[in-house]
Amino acid sequence: MSVIAGVFGALPPYRYSQRELTDSFVSIPDFEGYEDIVRQLHASAKVNSRHLVLPLEKYPKLTDFGEANKIFIEKAVDLGVQALAGALDESGLRPEDLDVLITATVTGLAVPSLDARIAGRLGLRADVRRVPLFGLGCVAGAAGVARLHDYLRGAPDGVAALVSVELCSLTYPGYKPTLPGLVGSALFADGAAAVVAAGVKRAQDIGADGPDILDSRSHLYPDSLRTMGYDVGSAGFELVLSRDLAAVVEQYLGNDVTTFLASHGLSTTDVGAWVTHPGGPKIINAITETLDLSPQALELTWRSLGEIGNLSSASVLHVLRDTIAKPPPSGSPGLMIAMGPGFCSELVLLRWH
């Protein structure tokens, strides 16, 4: 067992309403002829506002992938440092207490990786174990928490952290309209989050009162590589998004969840908190229907989507933070759910104190 000691979400300073973002997209010359579908997709996304790492007027001038990636490195490190410092502060721990740092991103490239840059800025120990995760996309928030637990099960005195940074707005330089890209333009935004967790002995020493991490389950689905992802080229990241995505969720997720819960003597009716990635209205509805949940079960997921959009891997960690702030009764199980490129799911079983 391991224990979540602190969760902190960080958002860039530029916040825009969905209407402002829609108007900006339809004003791009290459979007001529797409105005109706852009407005329709943006209106149906259930997103009210989003945060961006740059002022809106800067994006039309950003046409080079290399230039965008330089900005990504600078801003991602800034947000990652802010998120990790906040999570450590919530945990009552110092940077030098960290034994393991996992970083997750899919919206930019950095060598040395983000973890090395964040470690230097915050003053982590020279012997900190660094684990950069790239390519997991939306599933990486839950997968990263699961990997924290994997380490801490064997290190009861240890402390480990996950930092997720996604700057989706920087994946569009030189962008030409595609249907998946238009869907993404309605949903994705920028942000970061960090989770600090401790092994069971260290958690007792510091009085960590976040939920316990009990177990996790991964499932990589067959013949699904093109369900979701990016094609990376000279113009940046081109979104791959199958129209069958919701159907894949409905096909697999119900059995994944019921089997995993049953292995712990639980069913969906026992779960007091659903910590679910806000992938978009169709995905949230598919999860609700396939698990036969009440309309209120994913309230915090819907709220996160509306307030900040889809932050890829960081989103489920924002929902985790919101759930900790509004916890279920003591002793209640919780289930973290995220899905992403592969195509795959990651489930993390939690228990509230």
UniProtKB/Swiss-Prot annotation:
GO terms for biological process: DIM/DIP cell wall layer assembly; fatty acid biosynthetic process; lipid biosynthetic process; polyketide biosynthetic process. The keyword Transferase applies. It is an enzyme of class 2 (transferase). PANTHER family: 1,3,6,8-TETRAHYDROXYNAPHTHALENE SYNTHASE, HYDROXYMETHYLGLUTARYL-COA SYNTHASE. Belongs to the thiolase-like superfamily. Chalcone/stilbene synthases family. Homodimer. Could catalyze the elongation of hydroxybenzoyl-CoA as well as elongation of the aliphatic precursor involved in the synthesis of phthiocerol dimycocerosate (DIM). This is Polyketide synthase-like Pks10. It comes from Mycobacterium tuberculosis (strain ATCC 25618 / H37Rv).
